[in-house]
C-alpha cells in the first residue's frame, strides 16, 4: 500500500483526549533513542511528522497521526531513559498502560529494539505487557545500517531469545537511513488495517 496522506491529530495524556471515531490504530513503542520518530517519518514519507529529538525521553505524550484518512499511527512515549526521576518514569508507564488497557481500535503494537544491543529488561517487560493485553506484537530491529549483514543473524537470535519470541515470529530489520525494504515493511504493517476499514 502507499501512504498518500499523513497528518498530526492530537497529543494526548488522558483517555478522553483520544480520537473517538473508532478507526483502526497501530501503536509504536520503544526505548528512548531507539529511532521511533525517525522510523515513523520514514514510513510515512514525512520528514517532520514525528519530531526527532536529540534529547532522549522527550516524547512524553501519546501522539496520534491519521494516515490516508483510514487509520491512526500512534506514537507512545519512549521508556527506559535513565536521567529522569522515578516519579516521571512511573508517569510514562502509567500513560502507556492507560492507552493499552481496553483500547478497542488498537489492532497491533510495533515494539522497536536497537539491533546493535541485547534487548533490555524494559524491552522484555514491554513485550510481556503487550502480550498480556492481548494485542498482536510486531518486533522491528532498528538501525540495521549500523551492523554488517554477517551480524544480522546473530542479532536476530539474541533478540528472539531475550524477548522469548516464537520461532516463527517474523522479526524485521530496518534502517531509517537507507530505507531498505521500506515498501515491504509498510505493506506488512498496514495492509490488514486498511482491509478492516
Swiss-Prot record:
One of its GO terms (biological process) is division septum assembly. GTP binds at residues 30-37, 57-61, 75-78, 142-145, 174-176. It holds the Pfam family MMR_HSR1. Belongs to the TRAFAC class TrmE-Era-EngA-EngB-Septin-like GTPase superfamily. EngB GTPase family. Necessary for normal cell division and for the maintenance of normal septation. Mg(2+) binds at residues 37, 59. GO terms for molecular function: GTP binding; metal ion binding. Its cofactor is Mg(2+). Keywords: Cell cycle, Cell division, GTP-binding, Magnesium, Metal-binding, Nucleotide-binding, Septation. The gene is engB. PANTHER family: ENGB-TYPE G DOMAIN-CONTAINING PROTEIN (PTHR11649:SF13), MSS1/TRME-RELATED GTP-BINDING PROTEIN (PTHR11649). Residues 22-195 form the EngB-type G domain. This is Probable GTP-binding protein EngB.
Amino acid at each position: 500500500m502507499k501512504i498518500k496522506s499523513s497528518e498530526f491529530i492530537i497529543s494526548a495524556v488522558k483517555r478522553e483526549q483520544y480520537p473517538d471515531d473508532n478507526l483502526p490504530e497501530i501503536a509504536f513503542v520503544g526505548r528512548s533513542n531507539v529511532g521511533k520518530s525517525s522510523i515513523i517519518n520514514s514510513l510515512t514519507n514525512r520528514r517532520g511528522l514525528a519530531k526527532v529529538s536529540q534529547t532522549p525521553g522527550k516524547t512524553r505524550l501519546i501522539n496520534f497521526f491519521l494516515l490516508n484518512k483510514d487509520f491512526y499511527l500512534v506514537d507512545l512515549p519512549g521508556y527506559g531513559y535513565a536521567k529522569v526521576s522515578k516519579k516521571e518514569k512511573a508517569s510514562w508507564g502509567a500513560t502507556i498502560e492507560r492507552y493499552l488497557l481496553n483500547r478497542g481500535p488498537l489492532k497491533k503494537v510495533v515494539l522497536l529494539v536497537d539491533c546493535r544491543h541485547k534487548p533490555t529488561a524494559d524491552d522484555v517487560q514491554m513485550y510481556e505487557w503487550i502480550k498480556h493485553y492481548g494485542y498482536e506484537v510486531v518486533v522491528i530491529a532498528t538501525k540495521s545500517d549500523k551492523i554488517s549483514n554477517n551480524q544480522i543473524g546473530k542479532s536476530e537470535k539474541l533478540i528472539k531469545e531475550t524477548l522469548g519470541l516464537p520461532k516463527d515470529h517474523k522479526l524485521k530489520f530496518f534502517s531509517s537511513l537507507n530505507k531498505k525494504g521500506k515498501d515491504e515493511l509498510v505493506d506488512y504493517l498496514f495492509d490488514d488495517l486498511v482491509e478492516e476499514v
